[in-house]
Amino acid sequence: AITDILSAKDIEAALSSVKAAESFNYKTFFTKCGLAGKPTDQVKKVFDILDQDKSGYIEEDELQLFLKNFCSSARSLSNAETKAFLFAGDSDGDGKIGVDEFQALVRS
């Protein structure tokens, strides 16, 4: 579970910072939830949780539900938020985020 890696308190703080529509900022979220400071292996574990279909990539539909991985009652990201998140993370332009791209995004 994601709470094995990140504290429930930090997750709650991160989620409350993005409650409002169109308020999602991945840099702020990764910092507030504590993921930005985690070692590579723990970031990889979070990637594996986000990669719901185990394809080795986080695709757009998985990104849209990103917040729900942290708390099932969290909102879905809007189309604009999802596209901006994907654009920020997809450095090779293949339309999805691989594990190395995710590591770079978390640390950006």
Curated annotation (Swiss-Prot):
The protein's matches in Pfam families, at most eight in alphabetical order, are given as: EF-hand_7 (PF13499)
Supply one GO CC term from the record.
Answer: cytoplasm
Binding residues for Ca(2+) 1, per the UniProt record? 51, 53, 55, 57, 59, 62
A GO molecular function held by the record = calcium ion binding
The keyword Metal-binding belongs to this UniProt entry's keyword annotation: yes
GTP-binding in keyword set? no
The record's section on InterPro entries has: EF-hand-dom_pair, EF_Hand_1_Ca_BS, EF_hand_dom, Parvalbumin
* PANTHER family cross-referenced by the UniProt entry: PARVALBUMIN ALPHA, PARVALBUMIN, THYMIC
Q: What is this protein called?
A: Parvalbumin beta
- Provide the species name: Amphiuma means
